Amino acid sequence: LIELGLDYATQPIRTRTLDMEDPTFLALHPRGKIPILEDGGLEVSESPAIVTYLSETYGGDATQLIPNTPWARAKYFEWMSFISMELDATSLYVLRRHVDLHETYGEAPAANDTAREYFLRMIQSAVPALPSEGNFLLGNDFSGADILMISCLNFSDRYDFTLPSEITAYRERVSARPTYQAALEANNP
């Protein structure tokens, strides 16, 4: 939202709290998942869908977060899928459930070890896919894929991963952007 210069209001809801069981929240999002975006009379959930919707609805030439050419657009969706499935769902979400939320989901040391190993293997596999020119996942143009990647990298901090130097350098470039700093401040007052 900050990246696109949009005004917005948030309603913080912490995961696996009573807020997520509130009938008003469940009426809005029956799956009981966060994040969810309300825009006018529309509701959109799941981070990749939210980023894509916002970019396609509000992105202009200077703030377009999704490329327009078929090849670049395919690479965008390739990164979005990789980040969502391989980094987040397959590894970080397992750790979140069985480390952070073990009281709810139970302890699973073998699953945790496998998830850690998988995350490291997948993040290492991302290194050769980084463009040789430019600061971002799609080269010179910052995109919605960078938003998802930096979110996953930030979330991975709680598990003390040692990231490849190329990923650390990428992260530093994205983190130095003024809109990133503004979003970080807005989300962590």
Predicted features and spans:
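GST-like fold's C-terminal all-alpha helical module
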Residues: 79, 83-176
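Conserved beta-strand edge residues that scaffold enzyme active sites
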Residues: 15-16, 170, 188
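Structured helix-beta-strand junction loops
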Residues: 31, 61, 132-133, 177
